[in-house]
Swiss-Prot record:
It comes from Bordetella pertussis (strain Tohama I / ATCC BAA-589 / NCTC 13251). Residues 1-10 have a biased composition (Gly residues). Residues 1-20 are annotated as: Disordered. SUPFAM superfamilies: Ribosomal L27 protein-like. InterPro entries: Ribosomal_bL27, Ribosomal_bL27_CS. Keywords: Ribonucleoprotein, Ribosomal protein. GO terms for biological process: translation. This is Large ribosomal subunit protein bL27.
Length: 86
């Protein structure tokens, strides 16, 4: 009698779906108002001029223009601004 024992079970095989976080528009690139600049968890990047913050800490443009990254303050916080197009 050809037989095979039970294959057993595994406890592996799960992983969470990636959240696609990170910088979406880089320094010097043009952007339209309402477009997402950075998707992040917490305020790794802080909002500057013409940049708004969503409830999940997403940074988005409040005006058309060019994205500008800088470091500000005594704590050297990375800040994102949008220099408005004339």
């Amino acid at each position: 009698m050809a037989q095979k024992k039970g294959g057993g079970s595994t406890r592996n095989g799960r992983d969470s779906e990636s959240k696609r976080l990170g910088v979406k528009v880089y320094g010097g690139q043009s952007i339209l108002a309402g477009s997402i600049i950075v998707r992040q968890r917490g305020t790794r990047f802080h909002p500057g001029v013409n940049v708004g913050v969503g409830k999940d800490h997403t940074l988005f443009a409040l005006a058309n223009g060019k994205v500008h990254f800088s470091v500000k303050g005594a704590l050297n916080k990375p800040t994102v601004s949008v220099v408005a197009a004339e």
